[in-house]
Amino acid sequence: MPKSKVRKKNDFTISPVSRTPVKVKAGPSSVWFVALFVGLMLIGLIWLLVFQLAATNPVDAPGMLQWMADLGPWNYAIAFAFMITGLLLTMRWR
């Protein structure tokens, strides 16, 4: 049986893949970043609790927050905006 001819590798060569590790551009998040997003989520939670407990009392009740009661359903939007902002910041946390 005849032997096959061996090809010459002069036609083209494939360059080897670089195996050097690539450095990550940014390091871990700082402490203030963690405090910021946790704080924003807690502010939103506290806003909801205060609205439910202090602003929904009967009219002229002691301890009623009139300015918060005047906002009405916008209190939910404000509280959830704080919480969602904190949640979005957690996605940037390293």
Curated annotation (Swiss-Prot):
Highest taxon, organism lineage: Bacteria
GO terms (BP aspect): cell division
Principal location class: membrane
Entry coiled-coil feature ranges: none
GO cellular component: plasma membrane
Compartment list: Cell membrane
Membrane topology: Multi-pass membrane protein
Keywords tagged on the record: Cell cycle, Cell division, Cell membrane, Membrane, Transmembrane, Transmembrane helix
Residues that span the membrane, as ranges: 31-51, 71-91
Similarity comment: family membership: Belongs to the CrgA family.
Function description: Involved in cell division.
HAMAP family: CrgA
Record-given protein name: Cell division protein CrgA
